[in-house]
Amino acid sequence: MGFVPERFLTDERYRNGHINILAPKSGTKILGMHTPEMKKVAKEIVKSGDWQKQIECWQQHKPLCGAGGLTHEERMIWGLVINYVKVPLAERLQMLDTFIPAVDNWAICDNFCCNAKWVEKEDKEQIWQYIVTLISSEDEFRCRVGLILSLAHYLSDDNL
């Protein structure tokens, strides 16, 4: 577990503070990895060429870390992998549709959306239409993903 900060393992107050900020759903395992470490893991998964197999495992809720559901960090890394892979927009949006049900707190949502640099390089009108469908959803995090994507990538004079 070289990516887990020692302080998270040894300092109960720090660990509880970290968990309280994340506000995960009950039963979600938190390893304590920081975002730079998760980005490194995501980039390694993409670079390995095995990213599709890993996404399939995550879709089936098969964690990297053994038994049980996906950890908070695995959900974060899943989103980062989607952001880092070089695929056509239609394929990326399909991956996003399978990822969004795994989004269960603000940190996963906002981390994914703010690291979605591909939005700036793709057909912004097509992505906007997709975002509109997300925002109109009654699902809390599906709607939030749409809102945060729009705030992160469409809040400019050109789009207002």
Predicted segments, located by residue:
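Alpha-helical scaffold domains
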Residues: 1-160
